[in-house]
Amino acid sequence: PFTINGEVDFSDLERTAVNLKMHAENYELLNAPRTKRAMVYGKMYVDFNATLRGPVEELVMRGNMNILGKTNVTYVLKDSPLTVNDLLGDIVTFVNFNDTTSVEESSVQQISLGGMDVAMTMHIDQAVQARVDLVPDGSNYMLLEGGGDLSFQYTPQGDMLLTGRYSLMSGEMKYQIPIIPLKTFNIQNGSYVELSLIHI
């Protein structure tokens, strides 16, 4: 079960404050069947511990979430403007580290949660299986098995930051390249993605 314990202080209605503890073990966060309209389906299980304190206009949240190994989820890319020719354009970027030309950083529209301060750590078990269907019928996909430790931060100024390392034990990608039939690419054990102050 997901439990919330604590206090909500209404003594000053202009500055309502909370002091809450949230806890869940082996909690089924997602249980969604595959349907034509589903963007995410599968099952996700988590352990979750967090505190939420302060006036409602300036809430401070601290905690951690463990995504358990029996998790198996799929994300479906839908209504994507990508064509067959550039299907991987925004998913995989090949980098030449010898190229010293600078690339202008694209501007990202920030979403404000009203001064909330959030810092969460997230542990992903190595047995977690995650899949991305690159096309709705699932014929082109990425299947990843692995885990890691990530940190998420949301600042009162509206910045969302993600850091950490996601290590892969195995995986594969099936992708149909124009003129070339469906091809399978295997992901080697030991591959990883390093995230360093990624703005979301």
Please place each PLM-identified region on the residue numbering:
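Strand-loop-strand
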Residues: 1-198
